[in-house]
């Protein structure tokens, strides 16, 4: 087996992931943590190679790790431990890794593939695996090569765009969002539309205000489901203690502005007051407001509509959404239905995980199923 990589540094995306500590899996990862235009495609692979399988491999290499939160597992030392693990396993399996190399052409011949390398001899193989990743973070060499090659082999490509990416806001009526960089608030964000595109989802996580818009885990998660032109719905109250939150005996003497300042960071309270003040008498005491106005205010805070202008693109994205259409692949082997000698795995396929180690788990699981299928063909 030969691995060809155009990068000067091997496994660079692993190296930079998780702030340099590699969120190598999520111990709670399962089918519900993935999206695809072909829902359920990833289920088989995810059941065949579970987080506990990779955790066992990590432990066998005596790599210390810890859970950060919500099942996310990180190396105690650095991402280099995971890279070292993969290189050691490759050596054990007599895998040759050649990099940096430039692929000039890949041609299907009668019984094999011929891979021409710029300035080097060509290679031939009976099975070809495309594990090129997506287009996120082009600075480390990400490109559309895998997509272009798959298309050239007759496979359909679902539209791709940046995923797990911050959102931008440019309209004047939402300018307040960009005027409080650094402010963070735990919120619930609802996004998408059931039965359309990648469906609908809701995430209760932190949102971070930036000078361009919104970031933070809740926003990155929501970005996977968001479509251009859609609004997102923010529940600003979701993480607050709900008992007696609107008990008039407790809050009746306070104005809406004062309540906002009590519930939220000062700059966020000011921004919300600016937006709400266009429609409601926010300087009046809560007890002085009529029932209908109170209900409208509560509803507005629980389903606050924001319409992103866009996202911050591939340079700021963590993953690619979309990719090789899974209807052209066998879910048990990741084998192309157009050519039984071609396999496509990992991020190049239209399977995208949630934030928190799930995309690595898809990489491990899809690679495992592919490897088992190829191994079975070579069994005596």
Residue ranges of predicted features:
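A conserved beta-strand/loop element that lines the FAD pocket in flavoprotein oxidoreductases
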Residues: 91-103, 156
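A conserved FAD-binding loop/helix module that cradles the flavin
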Residues: 134-153, 351-380
């Amino acid at each position: 087996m030969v691995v060809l990589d155009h990068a000067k540094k091997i496994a660079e995306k692993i190296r930079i992931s998780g702030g340099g500590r590699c969120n190598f899996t999520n111990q709670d990862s399962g089918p519900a943590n993935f999206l695809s235009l072909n829902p359920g495609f990833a289920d088989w692979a995810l059941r065949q190679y579970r987080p506990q399988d990779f955790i066992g491999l990590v432990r066998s290499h005596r790599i210390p790790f810890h859970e950060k939160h919500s099942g996310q597992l990180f190396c105690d030392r650095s991402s280099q431990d995971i890279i070292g693990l993969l290189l050691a396993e490759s050596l054990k399996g007599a895998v040759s890794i050649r990099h940096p190399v430039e692929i000039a052409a890949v041609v299907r011949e009668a019984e094999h593939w011929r891979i021409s390398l710029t300035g080097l001899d060509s290679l031939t193989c009976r099975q070809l695996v495309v594990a090129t990743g997506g287009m996120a973070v082009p600075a480390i060499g990400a490109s559309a090569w895998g997509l272009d090659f798959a298309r050239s082999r007759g496979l359909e490509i679902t539209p791709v765009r940046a995923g797990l990416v911050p959102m931008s806001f440019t309209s004047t009526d939402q300018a307040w969002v960009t005027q409080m960089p650094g402010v963070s608030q735990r919120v619930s964000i609802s996004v998408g539309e059931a039965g359309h595109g990648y469906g609908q989802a809701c995430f209760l996580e932190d949102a971070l205000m930036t000078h361009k818009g919104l970031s933070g885990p809740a926003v990155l998660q929501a970005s996977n489901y968001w479509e251009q032109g859609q609004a997102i719905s923010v529940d600003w109250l979701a993480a607050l203690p709900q008992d007696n939150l609107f008990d008039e005996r407790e809050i009746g003497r306070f104005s809406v502005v004062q309540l906002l300042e009590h519930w939220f960071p000062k700059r966020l309270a000011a921004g919300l007051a600016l937006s709400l003040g266009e429609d409601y008498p926010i300087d009046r005491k809560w007890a002085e407001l009529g029932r209908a106005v109170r209900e409208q205010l509560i509803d507005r805070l629980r389903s606050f509509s924001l319409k992103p202008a866009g996202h911050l693109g591939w340079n700021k994205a963590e993953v690619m959404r979309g990719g090789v259409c899974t209807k052209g692949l066998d879910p048990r082997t990741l084998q192309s239905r157009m050519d039984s000698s071609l396999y496509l795995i990992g991020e190049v396929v239209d399977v995208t995980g949630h934030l928190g180690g799930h995309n690595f788990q898809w990489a491990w699981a899809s690679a495992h199923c592919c490897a088992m299928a190829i191994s079975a063909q070579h069994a005596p």
